[in-house]
């Protein structure tokens, strides 16, 4: 399952076609030693109001991923019942992706590697980076999961709009804000096919009324 929080996407659980949690199949009985998720952006292009950049096809400039798997896998550090071990044993059943560029569209290729004997790179003695499984690793294993998810990063979480919680959208004329605010609202309009008023309402709800999901709703 995926959870989007601002410019971050949290990876939590994997389910089978019956809706049954199957994380344990990739962790227990030594399976954590041969499994690792990889996340690779492909087919990158700017959104309707974005601009192409020279490094758009450099995965490290587009996304960042942090493996935050825990031991035990079904406990949380928040409850002080587990330790984060993703750095020394990356699996990717728990992790956070940060989208580093705004106004980009791409396919996020998510793959779960299953090594025949190991998930370590025998040439480097380390684990391959989250965005690029090596050729030798691919030769020595297979994919348990291989899928693409379309991603649109339509604006930056640092962008602001010159309205407050009590602003009445009815009283704000289209393009009646400052230049940066107008651009942000038009990005929302174009992405979700909304009117100026609808986009302004959505921004106010998201910014002021949706609650602080980062204050503890997602626990590792």
What are these model-predicted stretches?
Residues 123-219:
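Short beta-strand elements
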Residues 7-8, 70-143:
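Exposed beta-sheet edge/beta-hairpin loop segments within beta-rich domains
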Residues 2, 34, 105-107, 146-148:
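Extracellular structured ligand-interaction cores
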Residues 12-17:
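Beta-strand-rich structural segments
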Residues 19-22, 95-97:
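Extended, compositionally biased non-globular segments
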Residues 2-11:
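Short, small-residue-biased leader/transition segments that mark boundaries at the very start
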Residues 22-72:
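Extended, polar beta-sheet/loop recognition surfaces of beta-rich domains
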């Amino acid at each position: 399952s995926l959870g989007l929080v601002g410019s971050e996407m949290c990876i939590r659980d994997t389910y089978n076609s019956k809706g049954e949690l199957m994380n344990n199949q990739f962790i227990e009985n030594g399976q954590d030693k041969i499994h690792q998720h990889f996340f690779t952006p492909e087919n990158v292009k700017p959104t309707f109001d974005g601009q192409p950049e020279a490094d758009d096809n450099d995965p490290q400039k587009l996304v960042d991923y942090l493996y935050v798997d825990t031991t035990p896998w079904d406990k949380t550090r928040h409850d002080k019942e587990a330790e984060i071990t993703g750095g020394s044993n990356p699996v990717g059943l728990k992790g956070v992706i940060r989208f580093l560029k705004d106004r980009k569209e791409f396919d996020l290729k998510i793959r779960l590697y299953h090594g025949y004997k190991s998930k370590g790179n025998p040439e480097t003695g380390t684990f391959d980076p989250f965005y690029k499984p090596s050729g030798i690793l691919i030769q020595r294993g297979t994919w348990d999961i291989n899928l693409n998810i379309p991603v649109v990063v339509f604006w930056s979480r640092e962008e602001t709009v010159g309205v407050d919680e009590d602003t009445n959208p009815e009283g704000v004329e289209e393009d009646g804000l400052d230049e940066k605010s107008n651009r942000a609202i038009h990005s929302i309009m174009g992405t979700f096919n909304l009117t100026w008023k609808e986009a302004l309402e959505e921004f106010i709800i998201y910014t002021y009324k949706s609650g602080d999901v980062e204050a503890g709703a997602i626990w590792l």
